[in-house]
Structure formats: C-alpha cells, structure tokens
C-alpha cells in the first residue's frame, strides 16, 4: 500500500522534493491560490506553522490555477505575493494541477484516502459549489478537489487522517492540528 512518503512533488525551481523528508512529522497538504476569497487562510496557516513547526509541523503548499484561474502568476510571483502580504515562511512548491489528466499523483492518492463529504452549509458553501460546477470541474470524479484551500491532514505515521474543505471552520481545523501535534 502506498503512503505519502512514496511521492515526490516539484519545488518551485523545478527540482524534486520527496515527501520522505516529512517522515515523523504532522503535515498539512493544501492547494492554494493568491486571488481567491479564501486566500486569507494563508494567515491562519502561517500562525500554525510558527506555533508548531519546531514541534514537527510541516505545510506542503501546492499553488493551483484550476479554480477560476485564481493563481495566474509564475511560481516566483506567487511566492512574492505570499511573503509580502501574509509573511509566509513555509516553502511553496511548483504550481500544479490537483484534478484531471495532469493532476499530481499525490493528489490522486489523497483523494482515495479522504473522500469528499460535502462543502457544508451556508452561503460560502453554496457559492463554492456553484463556482466549482461552472469554473472548476474538470472530471466526473466525485472526490475531486472542489476549490482552493482544501486541506489534508497527515499524522506522524503518514496516515491521511482528515480532509477539510475551504468552507469549513479554520478554528475546527486548528483544533485538529493541535490534537495531532499533542499525540505521540
């Protein structure tokens, strides 16, 4: 059976990054965009990184332009935007697809480990659902990523333990991260 440690992704400079480097760490895997209504979640992610990085938290940031073209810049421009506006200190990887024919193999795996369970209730969830159907859907896989800032949470043993949609509470997500960080 595969684990996240079997995968590589590209760094922004095009070199390979092996997820084996994350063995024994808690990992947040997130597809991001700079022009999205959820982009301010970078602030919450950076706070988590600052709080827990020394205790073994890593963030795998995969910029993605598949959802309404909300990450249009080059890898360098995206990195500059994030460091300037959100003071991000965690590394960003190469902009990549998370759905469809060119999706990262890592994302194909993640979607088998944590299925899509819905966007939740409320106006944001309805808006994201409509936007996905009109501007983001690239396949008929019901477990595809539905928008930017979908987060997968991986425990220290490499198990993909949760999937959080961008419409879900960041407070609930932070509690889940805290619980994993405190687990031995």
Language-model-detected regions and their locations in the chain:
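N-terminal "domain-start" segment that seeds a small globular fold
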Residues: 1-20, 38
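Thiol/selenol-based redox catalytic cores and closely related redox-interacting motifs
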Residues: 81, 87-168
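Thiol-based oxidoreductase modules, predominantly thioredoxin-like and allied folds used
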Residues: 53-74, 89-100
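Non-catalytic, surface beta->alpha helical segment in thiol-disulfide oxidoreductase systems
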Residues: 161-183
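Short loop/turn microsegments at loop-to-beta-strand junctions
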Residues: 4-5, 27, 148-150
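Conserved helix-turn-beta segment immediately C-terminal to the redox Cys motif
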Residues: 25-26, 34-63, 82-86
